Amino acid sequence: MKDWTGTGRAYADSYASLCVGTAEALLGAFGTPGKRTLLDVGSGTGMLTAAFADAGWVATGCEPEPTMRDVALREHPEIPVCDGTLPDLPFEDGQFDVVVANFVLNHVADPRASAAELLRVSVDLVSATIWTNSPTWLWREVCERAALIPATGERLPPEKDFERTVDGFARMLDDAGWPRPQVSEITWTWSADATALWASAEGGVGGAGQFYRALDDAGRRSFRAAFEFVCAERSIAGRLPLAHSAAVAVAPRG
């Protein structure tokens, strides 16, 4: 699986603003917050957790990567962030009204066990998202321009893997014991800053960042030149409009 070690600042400056694009759909699915509690599992640098808190939820983050937690606590000091990782969260059964994992189950070694763990600590609703059209397509285009062979990415063993579609996600969650998971697909356009995107590559964020760091000097120069070419070709008013799609799942606890 991807190594996120030390990527907190680079992630906060780049993909955090993309991943929070699910906030509206999730908030709409969760209903009125009242004084209900919410756990954001794999909360990263805290941008989505903060969106939940701003909407009135009593929100808590849970993030295993130390530099992610450091950024979250620095930028959102009013929101508690715990150290914890799937599929063994440090919480009691039914400790939170709502439990959500945003773009987490596509990164874990055992998606079904991890999904079951989300269900365990929820008392009301459980929710998760995955990419159906992910940020990797941009970097594949960069690799093609640079005449570099893109990394294929690590695949899970067949018995652990699942199809990254609405139906495939629903089947996996059903296998994990989620009662009546409702899965829909949303699409939005992320207006990305090219400088921040490049910082994510140099900072080792995700598969593209790890691929870039593994290149020799000549490969890095080719990759950078191809990135600048793609950005110049796709940019509108200095921003990159990049379409992405996600499957959003919500299920009642029982």
Tell me the role of every PLM-derived stretch.
Residues 35-37, 124:
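Nucleotide donor/acceptor-binding cores
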Residues 37-88:
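Class I SAM-dependent methyltransferase SAM/SAH-binding core
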Residues 100:
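A conserved beta-strand element that flanks and buttresses the S-adenosyl-L-methionine
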Residues 19, 45-47, 160-254:
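Conserved Class I S-adenosyl-L-methionine
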Residues 108-117:
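A short, conserved alpha-helix within the catalytic core of class I
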Residues 103-104:
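Short catalytic micro-motifs in class I SAM-dependent methyltransferases
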Residues 1-34, 47-51, 67-75:
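Conserved class I S-adenosyl-L-methionine
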Residues 112, 123-193:
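Conserved catalytic/acceptor-binding region of the Class I
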